Amino acid sequence: MRRRTATTIATLSVAALLAGCGSSTPAASNKDPNKPLEVWTRSTEATAKVYEKIFKSFTDKTGVKVDYKPIYNDFDKQVQQRAASKDLPDVVITDTGSLGNFVKQGWTTEIKREDLAGSGDIVDRAWNNGKGADGKYYGVPFSTQAMVTLIRKDWREKLHKPIPTTWEELDDLARAFTRDDPDGNGQNDTYGMLVPGTVDRGYLAWWAASYIWQGGGDILEEEGGGKFSVGIDSPESTKAIERLRKLFCEDKVVQPGSLTLSTNDAHPLFESGKSGIYLTGPYMIGRFDKSVGKDKYEVIASPRGPAGATVLGEGEDIYLMAGSAKTADQKKLAEYLITPEAQQAGMKGDPQPVVRLPVNKNVDVNATYNDPRWATVAGVYKSEARPFPSVPNFTPFRQKTSETLNSIFAKCPADSSAELKSLADALKKELENQKASQ
């Protein structure tokens, strides 16, 4: 299998950037149909190794060669640059958060479920991850997941604190982790909450959304018929965000520097014993088992807020990109990736799975993982998870929300309602621009 180095990818990306500007029309391609299928994933080095094995198995079974390029940094920028040169990869595997933008730009093709072998084995709920605002499908589900709360169990037990089941207990635990020397080293060097709070890709909104929902608030409220209203400045949203502001600004239980952290930057701070509570996806379980120790941390459902325990539940999609000269091979790869064989290979990835919860109904989570923590994840996904609203393109809503929350948590105003009102006005304008306002 041929792989290009990150340097080569960067060089190609710069060349693409110089070739022209992106547009909302489908990208054309000058690809040779005899070349290998070019596949990109948003990956770390660890997950790239898992994908390599899966693609090798695909080639062994089908004879279709894959030119695999894991993208470690600036994924969205590199896709944009390739689109500008009208030479998109054949297949892209990335999170569902990219769906709206990919559709808007004309970068991904429509999926006909009935034409895809094995599509009937994909659970209906997972198909929602690939559905556009127009009701059509533009991505094939590959993996699903729900946010869970990771806690340093050894710290909690040392301080004789219960497993938190409510916001009040969670916040109390965060204060104790910050103030009561849970690691016993005699130093004031630990914090309660770890937050990937950068505005890049709207990460902070990804993290905060679960807590806003648990407080009874929302970023956007669905009104039916593909129409939405803004909920970010409602009394419930405001109260939920005030709670988070207090954790940042008054209790000071959040890891310093969190407002510039991406998820990849945040993970090592949990591993190194700097922070003890982490609301995140379950994909780090394997890595943390090795780096932190399986016996030193626990995986729990998010503690309940005033309105419940709802958390963000999304996943990864397989996008068959526009302009490909290899449409038959695109389809073959998508069909293989949703088979039980490929799904289980993705789940068993060491140290990190690329399939968290399977989309194929014939794959047994408990039998594959044999780990009660993954049963917890599956239970949360089934009963508490929800996606972001299916507006035509949620990216600008997530980005604007992230920027405002970042400002509130950094500046610590006594009253955040004015900034939330300004954000609400901006989101209303965006809804109007997307013709999705009530």
Give the ranges of each region predicted by the language model.
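Short, low-complexity disordered leader/linker segments with a strong preference
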Residues: 1-38, 60, 425-438
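Short, well-ordered beta-strand elements
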Residues: 32-44, 64-69, 90-91, 138, ...
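Extracytoplasmic "Venus flytrap"/periplasmic binding protein-like
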Residues: 54-123, 154-165, 268-269, 276-277, ...
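Extracytoplasmic/periplasmic solute-binding protein
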Residues: 138-142, 147, 171-229
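Conserved C-terminal helix/tail region of periplasmic/extracytoplasmic solute-binding proteins
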Residues: 157, 381-438
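C-terminal lobe and pocket-closing loops
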Residues: 282-294, 305-403, 438
